[in-house]
Amino acid sequence: MIGRLRGVLVEKQAPEILMDVNGVGYELQMPLTSFYELPEIDHETVVYTHFVVREDAQLLYGFITKQERALFRLLIKTNGVGPKLALTILSGMTASEFVGCVERDDIVTLVKLPGVGKKTAERLLVEMRDKLKSLMEASAGSEREFVLQSNYSPTPTVNSAEEDAISALISLGYKPPQASKSVSAAYKEGMDSETLIKAALKSML
């Protein structure tokens, strides 16, 4: 089990990164909430991981905090929610927004996420309510503190902002026309890709 990596960030293209750990390159997929807290290329970083072994692949999912990883692990225990959908959920909204949806029984917001239909949203609301309650009690408030705060801080990129934003949304499950339309509508002069992705996602929720 690979639970934590410390190494140099070699590549990053939302939602994937490549880390050099003692000469070994690790490819990871990350939710955008974690991705945009990463340092610049060639800087050292620490990433908490969840390792998935399938018949056709071995996948690593990365998170900036142990708390966000814990929330990811709760999500994939929900019937009908796999790692890819859990990653999409945590990319489409912050942890605090997700918890807010659960507390308010806000099915309308959840079904706007790609891959989340009405039945899946209903299961999330029912199953995650009890799981989150147990998590908060077990952690004596530390997880609660996490999910009610967001340290999201976009950093500039040298790539085309609109192209990167569209590519990131498509990788999360949005259809190309929908991704292109939302990015074009959200774009303002001078926006970097991270800010643009956040604005485009918000416009669809």
UniProtKB/Swiss-Prot annotation:
One of its GO terms (molecular function) is four-way junction DNA binding. Gene3D superfamilies: 5' to 3' exonuclease, C-terminal subdomain, DNA helicase RuvA subunit, C-terminal domain, Nucleic acid-binding proteins. Residues 65-143 are annotated as: Domain II. Disulfide bonds: none annotated. Residues 157-205 are annotated as: Domain III. GO terms for biological process: DNA recombination; DNA repair. Residues 144-156 are annotated as: Flexible linker. Keywords: Cytoplasm, DNA damage, DNA recombination, DNA repair, DNA-binding. The keyword Cell wall biogenesis/degradation does not apply. One of its GO terms (cellular component) is Holliday junction resolvase complex. Its main location: cytoplasm. The RuvA-RuvB-RuvC complex processes Holliday junction (HJ) DNA during genetic recombination and DNA repair, while the RuvA-RuvB complex plays an important role in the rescue of blocked DNA replication forks via replication fork reversal (RFR). RuvA specifically binds to HJ cruciform DNA, conferring on it an open structure. The RuvB hexamer acts as an ATP-dependent pump, pulling dsDNA into and through the RuvAB complex. HJ branch migration allows RuvC to scan DNA until it finds its consensus sequence, where it cleaves and resolves the cruciform DNA. Has three domains with a flexible linker between the domains II and III and assumes an 'L' shape. Domain III is highly mobile and contacts RuvB. Homotetramer. Forms an RuvA(8)-RuvB(12)-Holliday junction (HJ) complex. HJ DNA is sandwiched between 2 RuvA tetramers; dsDNA enters through RuvA and exits via RuvB. An RuvB hexamer assembles on each DNA strand where it exits the tetramer. Each RuvB hexamer is contacted by two RuvA subunits (via domain III) on 2 adjacent RuvB subunits; this complex drives branch migration. In the full resolvosome a probable DNA-RuvA(4)-RuvB(12)-RuvC(2) complex forms which resolves the HJ. This is Holliday junction branch migration complex subunit RuvA. The lineage of its organism: Bacteria, Pseudomonadati, Pseudomonadota, Gammaproteobacteria, Alteromonadales.
